[in-house]
From Swiss-Prot:
Its EC number is 6.1.1.21. The keyword Ribonucleoprotein does not apply. It holds the Pfam family HGTP_anticodon. It catalyses: tRNA(His) + L-histidine + ATP = L-histidyl-tRNA(His) + AMP + diphosphate + H(+). It comes from Thermotoga petrophila (strain ATCC BAA-488 / DSM 13995 / JCM 10881 / RKU-1). Homodimer. GO terms for biological process: histidyl-tRNA aminoacylation. It is found in: Cytoplasm. The lineage of its organism: Bacteria, Thermotogati, Thermotogota, Thermotogae, Thermotogales. Signal peptide: none annotated. Belongs to the class-II aminoacyl-tRNA synthetase family. This is Histidine--tRNA ligase. The keyword Chaperone does not apply. InterPro entries: aa-tRNA-synth_II, aa-tRNA-synth_II/BPL/LPL, Anticodon-bd, Anticodon-bd_dom_sf, His-tRNA-ligase, HisRS-like_core, HisRS/HisZ, HisRS_anticodon.
């Protein structure tokens, strides 16, 4: 039987892995430079955690979660997003005892049963962070500023930040009523999902891809904000303008998770077609209470690694690729192998990537393999070289080679390689 990867998943290797390393390492550097700590949570949680946080009527809960019963009969779900697990960890481990203004970032796989397509997989990967404890618009500004910093550090430029405020639970009541009145007049024209959401979660009608043209003329949430939410939103825009972070106000933006309040935003890249959202986030001031904790203001963001990589490729951004087969040690015979291993150890201490042949191949076979793996240099050691106390350093691109005294080989090779 030939085993194949599950539909909606990917194997990542070769040159592709360096895109992942580039995104992940850039994200870590940006987060840690801003005082954000790493947190790691399990990839599966109690199903109820996501039902309560994401929303029972959301598409994620209704259609997309990977849910199963374990041997103890408990309902378990592979995490479809990263915020709820971080909040659960915060509450369970009493991290609030460390005080407010806490920041945590995460990197890892998420799971949703969706139709696989470019940039949308069933196992996908996210980078994200949460800022916990501040209700000030300064926190909202910091999140958006750091997202913008991260994307620019990657080299991306062809994206736009879409921004909206959907208000708090108090002012959103009037907004829902306005949407009910507007959509009630055209209910017969709406798709089946929108007809269902009309009764259960009317804000999600603004997010419908089928009936999006109706959303363009729908009432705007900003026109129904209470004084506090309006001040919060205006102050956020003031900060963004002061620091020249470009954004576009998008009054149809609500996001797909029910826990959002006030600020919501998305980052969309012009080179990705229909699936052009590469990051998004917002504020979720009520989520801690919903999950059994005290009232704690918080907000965060998540970015899809697969889509960010597509954006990097769309902009043809060159990424750093390390040659892990830079030097290939070719040995002929047992004594030569022992000396070759010792040489490799010494070169690795110098920070070089060094591979040693372990297949007992002939000289031609070892050199052929070194070429195939992309090695730049080969170090050749055989009985004759051992007798002379030398090694041969061959440049596999030019074919030039030089004999090097074994006693000085490590320093010579390290210096030679560093010049290229």
């Amino acid at each position: 039987m030939n085993y194949k990867r599950i539909k909606g998943t990917n194997d990542i290797f070769g040159e592709e892995i360096w895109y992942w390393r580039y995104v992940e390492e850039t994200f870590r550097n940006v987060c840690e430079s801003a005082g954000i700590e790493e947190i790691r949570t399990p990839i599966f949680e109690q199903t109820e955690l996501f039902v309560r946080s994401v929303g029972e009527e959301s598409d994620i809960v209704q259609k997309e979660m990977y849910t199963f019963q374990d041997k103890a009969g408990r309902s378990i779900t592979l995490r479809p997003e990263g915020t709820a697990p971080v909040v659960r960890a915060f509450l369970e481990n009493s991290l609030i005892d460390r005080g407010f203004q806490q920041r945590y970032y995460y990197i890892g796989p998420m799971f949703r049963y969706e139709k696989p397509q470019s940039g949308r997989l069933r196992q996908f990967h996210q980078v994200g962070f949460e800022i916990i404890g501040s209700e000030s618009p300064k926190a909202d500004f910091e999140v958006i500023m750091l997202v913008d910093t991260f994307l620019r550090k990657l080299g991306l430029t062809k994206y736009r930040i879409h921004l909206n405020s959907i208000g708090c639970s108090a002012c959103r009541k009037n907004y829902r009523e306005a949407l009910k009145e507007y959509y009630g007049q055209i209910l017969a024209n709406l798709c089946d999902d929108c007809k269902r959401r009309y009764e259960t979660n009317i804000l999600r009608l603004l997010d419908c891809k089928v009936d999006h043209e109706y959303a363009l003329n729908a009432p705007k949430s900003v026109d129904y904000l209470c004084d506090s939410c309006k001040t919060h939103y205006e102050k956020l825009k003031e900060y963004l303008n002061t620091f020249e972070i470009e954004y576009v106000e998008d009054h149809t933006l609500v996001r797909g998770l029910d826990y959002y309040t006030r600020t919501v935003f998305e980052v969309r890249h012009e080179g990705l077609g229909a699936q052009n959202t590469i990051a998004g986030g917002g504020r979720y001031d009520g989520l801690f209470v919903e999950l059994g904790g005290s009232s704690v203001p918080a907000l965060g963001f998540a970015g899809g690694i697969e889509r960010i990589i597509l954006a990097l490729k769309a902009e043809e951004i060159e990424i750093p690729i390390k040659n892990v087969h830079l030097v290939y040690v070719v040995t002929l015979g047992e004594k030569a192998f022992a000396d070759g291993v010792q040489l490799a150890v010494e070169l690795r201490k110098k920070g070089l990537s060094v591979d040693v042949d372990i297949m007992d191949r002939k000289l031609s076979g070892q050199l052929k393999h070194a070429h195939r793996m992309g090695s730049r240099y080969a170090v050749i050691i055989g009985d004759e070289e051992l007798e002379k106390g030398i090694v041969i350093l061959r440049d596999l691109e030019t074919g030039d080679q030089v004999e090097v005294d074994r006693d000085f080989a490590v320093d010579y090779i390290a210096e030679r390689v560093s010049k290229d």
